[in-house]
Protein backbone atom coordinates (compact mmCIF):
# COMPACT_ATOMS: atom_id res chain seq x y z
CA UNK A 1 0.00 0.00 0.00
CA UNK A 2 2.92 2.37 0.63
CA UNK A 3 3.79 4.74 3.41
CA UNK A 4 1.32 7.01 5.18
CA UNK A 5 1.20 10.47 3.61
CA UNK A 6 1.11 12.20 6.99
CA UNK A 7 3.08 11.81 10.21
CA UNK A 8 0.65 9.51 12.01
CA UNK A 9 0.58 8.06 15.50
CA UNK A 10 -1.88 5.23 16.07
CA UNK A 11 -4.19 5.96 19.00
CA UNK A 12 -5.08 2.89 21.01
CA UNK A 13 -8.14 3.93 23.04
CA UNK A 14 -10.48 1.96 20.76
CA UNK A 15 -8.57 -1.24 21.45
CA UNK A 16 -9.79 -1.32 25.04
CA UNK A 17 -13.14 -1.74 26.77
CA UNK A 18 -15.46 0.96 25.52
CA UNK A 19 -14.53 4.14 23.72
CA UNK A 20 -16.28 7.27 22.60
CA UNK A 21 -19.50 8.97 23.52
CA UNK A 22 -21.74 9.09 20.48
CA UNK A 23 -20.27 6.16 18.62
CA UNK A 24 -20.05 3.02 20.71
CA UNK A 25 -18.58 -0.02 19.00
CA UNK A 26 -18.19 -3.59 20.27
CA UNK A 27 -14.93 -4.44 21.97
CA UNK A 28 -12.37 -5.10 19.28
CA UNK A 29 -11.03 -8.61 18.87
CA UNK A 30 -7.35 -9.37 19.23
CA UNK A 31 -7.36 -10.57 15.64
CA UNK A 32 -8.59 -7.22 14.32
CA UNK A 33 -6.10 -5.35 16.50
CA UNK A 34 -3.30 -7.49 15.08
CA UNK A 35 -4.44 -6.63 11.53
CA UNK A 36 -4.42 -2.92 12.37
CA UNK A 37 -0.95 -3.14 13.89
CA UNK A 38 0.41 -5.02 10.88
CA UNK A 39 -1.08 -2.48 8.48
CA UNK A 40 0.25 0.42 10.53
CA UNK A 41 3.75 -1.03 10.65
CA UNK A 42 3.78 -1.84 6.93
CA UNK A 43 2.87 1.78 6.14
CA UNK A 44 5.48 3.49 8.26
CA UNK A 45 3.45 4.30 11.37
CA UNK A 46 6.12 4.34 14.05
CA UNK A 47 4.38 5.17 17.33
CA UNK A 48 1.44 3.92 19.40
CA UNK A 49 -0.43 6.30 21.70
CA UNK A 50 -1.34 4.62 25.00
CA UNK A 51 -2.66 5.71 28.38
CA UNK A 52 -2.97 4.01 31.73
CA UNK A 53 -6.70 4.69 31.54
CA UNK A 54 -7.19 2.62 28.37
CA UNK A 55 -8.60 -0.43 30.09
CA UNK A 56 -7.43 -3.75 28.73
CA UNK A 57 -5.12 -2.39 26.02
CA UNK A 58 -1.80 -3.32 27.62
CA UNK A 59 -3.09 -6.83 28.31
CA UNK A 60 -4.14 -7.30 24.69
CA UNK A 61 -0.82 -6.01 23.40
CA UNK A 62 1.09 -8.35 25.70
CA UNK A 63 -0.94 -11.26 24.34
CA UNK A 64 -0.58 -10.22 20.68
CA UNK A 65 3.08 -9.27 20.97
CA UNK A 66 4.31 -5.98 19.56
CA UNK A 67 7.71 -7.49 18.71
CA UNK A 68 9.40 -4.12 19.29
CA UNK A 69 7.96 -2.81 16.03
CA UNK A 70 6.69 0.46 17.48
CA UNK A 71 7.75 3.30 19.70
CA UNK A 72 5.39 3.69 22.66
CA UNK A 73 3.89 6.90 24.00
CA UNK A 74 1.74 6.88 27.11
CA UNK A 75 -0.23 9.23 29.35
CA UNK A 76 -0.64 9.20 33.13
CA UNK A 77 -3.00 10.95 35.53
CA UNK A 78 -0.89 12.63 38.18
CA UNK A 79 -3.25 14.33 40.63
CA UNK A 80 -4.59 11.45 42.73
CA UNK A 81 -1.60 9.12 42.52
CA UNK A 82 1.82 9.23 44.11
CA UNK A 83 4.94 9.44 42.00
CA UNK A 84 5.97 6.06 43.39
CA UNK A 85 2.75 4.31 42.36
CA UNK A 86 2.86 5.88 38.90
CA UNK A 87 6.46 4.80 38.44
CA UNK A 88 5.55 1.26 39.45
CA UNK A 89 2.63 1.22 37.01
CA UNK A 90 4.84 2.47 34.18
CA UNK A 91 7.45 -0.19 34.96
CA UNK A 92 4.71 -2.83 34.96
CA UNK A 93 3.46 -1.65 31.56
CA UNK A 94 6.95 -1.75 30.08
CA UNK A 95 7.45 -5.27 31.37
CA UNK A 96 4.11 -6.42 29.94
CA UNK A 97 4.98 -4.87 26.58
CA UNK A 98 8.51 -6.26 26.61
CA UNK A 99 9.85 -2.74 26.10
CA UNK A 100 12.78 -0.92 27.66
CA UNK A 101 11.40 2.62 27.63
CA UNK A 102 8.61 4.88 26.42
CA UNK A 103 9.17 7.25 23.56
CA UNK A 104 7.09 9.81 25.46
CA UNK A 105 5.17 10.20 28.70
CA UNK A 106 2.51 12.89 28.96
CA UNK A 107 0.50 14.14 31.92
CA UNK A 108 -3.17 13.46 31.20
CA UNK A 109 -5.90 15.96 32.19
CA UNK A 110 -3.44 18.79 32.86
CA UNK A 111 -6.27 21.20 33.63
CA UNK A 112 -7.35 19.15 36.65
CA UNK A 113 -4.09 19.87 38.50
CA UNK A 114 -3.41 22.73 40.89
CA UNK A 115 -0.39 24.96 40.29
CA UNK A 116 1.66 23.09 42.89
CA UNK A 117 0.63 19.75 41.41
CA UNK A 118 1.70 20.94 37.97
CA UNK A 119 5.13 21.89 39.31
CA UNK A 120 5.40 18.50 40.98
CA UNK A 121 4.24 16.74 37.83
CA UNK A 122 6.92 18.47 35.75
CA UNK A 123 9.60 17.41 38.24
CA UNK A 124 8.25 13.86 38.08
CA UNK A 125 8.47 13.84 34.30
CA UNK A 126 11.96 15.31 34.33
CA UNK A 127 13.11 12.60 36.73
CA UNK A 128 11.63 9.90 34.49
CA UNK A 129 13.50 11.28 31.52
CA UNK A 130 16.77 11.40 33.46
CA UNK A 131 16.24 7.77 34.44
CA UNK A 132 15.75 6.80 30.82
CA UNK A 133 12.12 5.77 31.26
CA UNK A 134 11.10 8.20 28.49
CA UNK A 135 12.83 10.00 25.65
CA UNK A 136 10.38 12.91 25.64
CA UNK A 137 7.95 14.39 28.16
CA UNK A 138 4.91 16.59 27.87
CA UNK A 139 1.26 17.23 28.62
CA UNK A 140 -2.16 16.50 27.16
CA UNK A 141 -4.49 19.52 27.12
CA UNK A 142 -8.00 20.47 26.01
CA UNK A 143 -7.91 24.28 25.91
CA UNK A 144 -5.34 26.88 24.90
CA UNK A 145 -5.50 28.54 28.34
CA UNK A 146 -3.75 25.46 29.75
CA UNK A 147 -0.57 26.47 27.93
CA UNK A 148 -0.04 29.41 30.26
CA UNK A 149 1.21 27.26 33.14
CA UNK A 150 3.97 25.23 31.53
CA UNK A 151 7.66 25.84 31.05
CA UNK A 152 10.43 24.76 28.73
CA UNK A 153 10.80 21.39 30.42
CA UNK A 154 7.88 20.36 28.23
CA UNK A 155 8.76 18.86 24.86
CA UNK A 156 5.35 17.68 23.61
CA UNK A 157 1.85 19.11 23.78
CA UNK A 158 -1.00 16.88 22.67
CA UNK A 159 -4.13 18.91 21.95
CA UNK A 160 -7.42 18.66 20.04
CA UNK A 161 -7.72 19.82 16.45
CA UNK A 162 -10.73 19.41 14.19
CA UNK A 163 -13.19 21.35 12.04
CA UNK A 164 -15.14 22.49 15.11
CA UNK A 165 -12.08 23.35 17.21
CA UNK A 166 -9.07 25.18 15.80
CA UNK A 167 -8.33 27.54 18.71
CA UNK A 168 -4.71 26.44 19.10
CA UNK A 169 -3.95 27.55 15.54
CA UNK A 170 -4.75 31.15 16.50
CA UNK A 171 -2.98 31.09 19.87
CA UNK A 172 0.17 33.18 20.38
CA UNK A 173 1.42 31.06 23.29
CA UNK A 174 1.15 27.89 21.21
CA UNK A 175 3.17 29.53 18.44
CA UNK A 176 5.82 30.68 20.90
CA UNK A 177 6.14 27.19 22.36
CA UNK A 178 6.44 25.66 18.91
CA UNK A 179 9.07 28.25 17.98
CA UNK A 180 11.05 27.16 21.04
CA UNK A 181 10.99 23.52 20.00
CA UNK A 182 7.85 22.14 21.63
CA UNK A 183 6.22 19.57 19.33
CA UNK A 184 2.44 19.81 18.95
CA UNK A 185 0.55 16.58 18.32
CA UNK A 186 -3.08 16.75 17.17
CA UNK A 187 -5.79 14.43 18.42
CA UNK A 188 -9.59 14.29 17.92
CA UNK A 189 -9.34 15.16 14.22
CA UNK A 190 -12.52 13.13 13.63
CA UNK A 191 -14.21 14.55 16.76
CA UNK A 192 -15.00 11.15 18.30
CA UNK A 193 -15.92 9.93 14.83
CA UNK A 194 -18.81 12.36 14.41
CA UNK A 195 -17.16 14.19 11.50
CA UNK A 196 -17.14 10.92 9.57
CA UNK A 197 -20.86 10.50 10.13
CA UNK A 198 -22.52 13.82 10.96
CA UNK A 199 -25.83 12.09 11.75
CA UNK A 200 -24.28 11.09 15.06
CA UNK A 201 -24.05 14.74 16.17
CA UNK A 202 -26.85 15.97 18.47
CA UNK A 203 -29.86 17.40 16.67
CA UNK A 204 -29.39 20.80 18.35
CA UNK A 205 -26.23 21.31 16.28
CA UNK A 206 -27.96 21.20 12.91
CA UNK A 207 -26.41 24.48 11.79
CA UNK A 208 -22.86 23.37 12.60
CA UNK A 209 -23.48 20.01 10.94
CA UNK A 210 -24.77 21.69 7.78
CA UNK A 211 -21.78 24.05 7.69
CA UNK A 212 -19.34 21.13 7.80
CA UNK A 213 -21.21 19.28 5.08
CA UNK A 214 -21.15 22.42 2.91
CA UNK A 215 -17.40 22.85 3.58
CA UNK A 216 -16.78 19.34 2.29
CA UNK A 217 -19.09 19.80 -0.69
CA UNK A 218 -17.54 23.13 -1.70
CA UNK A 219 -14.06 21.63 -1.84
CA UNK A 220 -15.15 18.31 -3.36
CA UNK A 221 -14.13 16.30 -0.31
CA UNK A 222 -15.50 13.21 1.37
CA UNK A 223 -16.19 13.52 5.08
CA UNK A 224 -12.89 11.74 5.76
CA UNK A 225 -10.95 14.10 3.51
CA UNK A 226 -12.75 17.10 4.98
CA UNK A 227 -11.77 16.12 8.50
CA UNK A 228 -8.15 15.47 7.54
CA UNK A 229 -7.93 18.72 5.57
CA UNK A 230 -7.90 20.67 8.84
CA UNK A 231 -4.61 19.00 9.78
CA UNK A 232 -3.27 19.22 6.22
CA UNK A 233 -3.93 22.97 5.97
CA UNK A 234 -2.00 24.17 9.03
CA UNK A 235 1.62 24.21 10.23
CA UNK A 236 1.46 24.18 14.04
CA UNK A 237 0.75 20.48 14.57
CA UNK A 238 3.37 18.19 13.07
CA UNK A 239 1.94 14.83 14.10
CA UNK A 240 -1.57 13.40 13.94
CA UNK A 241 -2.89 10.91 16.49
CA UNK A 242 -5.72 8.90 14.96
CA UNK A 243 -7.87 6.07 16.26
CA UNK A 244 -9.64 3.47 14.16
CA UNK A 245 -12.21 0.75 14.71
CA UNK A 246 -10.91 -1.66 12.07
CA UNK A 247 -8.10 -2.16 9.58
CA UNK A 248 -10.19 -0.90 6.67
CA UNK A 249 -10.56 2.50 8.35
CA UNK A 250 -6.82 2.77 8.82
CA UNK A 251 -6.29 1.86 5.18
CA UNK A 252 -8.66 4.61 4.06
CA UNK A 253 -6.87 7.18 6.21
CA UNK A 254 -3.46 6.11 4.94
CA UNK A 255 -4.61 6.33 1.32
CA UNK A 256 -6.46 9.63 1.73
CA UNK A 257 -4.57 12.30 -0.25
CA UNK A 258 -3.15 15.32 1.53
CA UNK A 259 -5.57 18.19 0.96
CA UNK A 260 -4.27 21.63 1.87
CA UNK A 261 -6.89 24.38 1.66
CA UNK A 262 -5.39 27.87 1.79
CA UNK A 263 -8.63 29.43 3.00
CA UNK A 264 -9.23 26.85 5.74
CA UNK A 265 -8.67 29.24 8.65
CA UNK A 266 -11.19 31.66 7.16
CA UNK A 267 -13.81 28.95 6.70
CA UNK A 268 -13.79 27.03 9.96
CA UNK A 269 -16.20 28.15 12.69
CA UNK A 270 -14.95 29.81 15.87
CA UNK A 271 -16.55 30.45 19.24
CA UNK A 272 -18.77 27.36 19.15
CA UNK A 273 -20.48 26.24 22.39
CA UNK A 274 -18.38 24.03 24.65
CA UNK A 275 -21.20 21.48 24.63
CA UNK A 276 -20.23 20.74 21.04
CA UNK A 277 -16.46 21.09 21.00
CA UNK A 278 -15.59 19.34 24.29
CA UNK A 279 -16.38 15.59 24.32
CA UNK A 280 -16.08 15.55 28.12
CA UNK A 281 -19.42 17.37 28.23
CA UNK A 282 -21.19 14.91 25.97
CA UNK A 283 -23.73 12.40 27.24
CA UNK A 284 -22.82 8.78 26.65
CA UNK A 285 -25.05 6.89 24.27
Language-model segments: residues:
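N-terminal binding-site loop/beta-alpha segment at the start of enzyme catalytic domains
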Residues: 1-70
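Hydrophobic faces of well-ordered beta-strands that scaffold small-molecule active sites
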Residues: 6-11, 48-50, 70-74, 102-107, ...
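A structural motif
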Residues: 42-45, 99-102, 134, 154, ...
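Beta/alpha (TIM)-barrel catalytic core signal, keyed to glycine-rich beta->alpha loops juxtaposed to Asp/Glu
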Residues: 110-277, 281-284
Amino acid sequence: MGRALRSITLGCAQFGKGYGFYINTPEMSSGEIAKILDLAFDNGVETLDLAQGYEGVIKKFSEIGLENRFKLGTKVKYGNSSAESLSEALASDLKALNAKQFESILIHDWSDLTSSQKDSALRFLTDLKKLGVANFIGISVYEKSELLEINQEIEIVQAPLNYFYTDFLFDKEARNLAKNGVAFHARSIFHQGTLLNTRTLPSNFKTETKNYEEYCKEHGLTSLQGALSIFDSQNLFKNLVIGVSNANQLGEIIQSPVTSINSMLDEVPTGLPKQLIDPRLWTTK
